[in-house]
Amino acid sequence: MKLLVVGGGGREHAIIRSLKKNPAVETIYALPGNGGIAQDAVCVNIGATDLDGIVNFAKENAIDYAVVAPDDPLVLGCVDRLNEAGIPCFGPRANAAIIEGSKAFSKNLMKKYGIPTASYEIFTDLEAALRYLETAPIPTVVKADGLALGKGVIIAQTREEAVEAVTDMMANAKFGKSGSTVVIEEFLTGPEVSVLAFTDGKTVKPMVSSMDHKRAGDNDTGLNTGGMGTVAPNPYYTDTIAERCMKEIFLPTIAAMNAEGRTFKGCLYFGLMLTPKGPKVIEYNCRFGDPETQVVLPLLESDLLTVMQATTNGTLADTEVKFADQHACCVITASSGYPESYKKGYPITMTEKAAAATFVAGAKLENGTLLTSGGRVTGTTAVADSLAEAVKEAYRLADGVQFENAYRRSDIGQKALQAKQ
């Protein structure tokens, strides 16, 4: 089989490594891929949002199955285009990817179908939003409606911060068109849990839960990032809570999308908060999370390609999705200065052991040398029988990844370890 994976980050590297385990897979093409993915797949310089380029490549190379991993191409209709060309895909069509593509859509969906979430207001007019903020409870959460690379959510601790966030998005177009509509919502408290789930639009098979570490600095200080590390499973996500989420959130979401004529097939990511009043949805993503994928897939015992094809074919109910009863920890090594400005182009060295455990995100290959090319450069994952061992081993392996100006949080997994006690 010839496979195509759209995307070029650490998440895609993890997906490709898992897909490679299937003996029927001959070749995997990554569009565009990156310098590290080039060790595991054939990288082709076609951008993830170049839909014409992707479709033409897939047709010319007789691709048997495609996986569209990032949010942008999904929201733009990459799966629709590939399907029209007769190529089966993993991922939702554009009319279902809107669940991530528009926060206003997803909030209204939850309200209409009684899915627990924070109370909210939606604004398309700056003056109205500012008037609302005069009396809104503080802290409050301001979200850009559209895609903003995971950076379009501001937790405003003061009224001034809320006004600044809304003005930045609506008047100063900080996120372009994505911020022309904003959602202002109630600030919720409680542990956060990420749950990725396979779905064929009928059956939902959740993956092992995980805990992300969003802030740039230790002890959750500093700016929000795309994620500095993850552990799985999440100790706060007990069997009782999992059952409740399936009944109150996962199945109702799939049913709601079906009722709206927007059947969702692929990976649906539930960003949850376990509030004193029960689990609530903070956000939906229409794809595998990054860096959640880097801990979830290494624990998957079932064959990934088989499960993906079952979501496409509507046979997920008859397909086993099994995870190892172990723990995983992923530690991100980033360029110092991320998520703001940082220098790139530094050579990366990895020990053999580190390379085998590392998914590459922001790196390019030049004359056989791997050079840093992004903020988050690598993610190094260890799997062990206990969380403490997985954390220790992930850091030990990550020490084998080196480049100038490298930066890691030193406390990935500590919150989870405390929760277990």
Listing of model-derived features with the role each one plays in the protein:
Residues 43-49, 121-125, 156:
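Short acidic-hydrophobic, aromatic-tinged amphipathic segments that line or gate anion-handling sites
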Residues 21, 36-38, 90, 112-114, ...:
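Solvent-exposed alpha-helices and their adjacent loops that cap or buttress functional pockets
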Residues 310-421:
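Peripheral (often C-terminal) accessory segments that flank ATP-dependent C-N-forming ligase machineries
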Residues 152, 156-291:
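Internal nucleotide-binding/catalytic subdomain
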Residues 90-152:
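A conserved helix-loop-beta module that forms one wall/lid of the active-site cleft
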Residues 1-94:
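ATP-binding N-terminal substructure of ATP-dependent carboxylate-amine bond-forming enzymes
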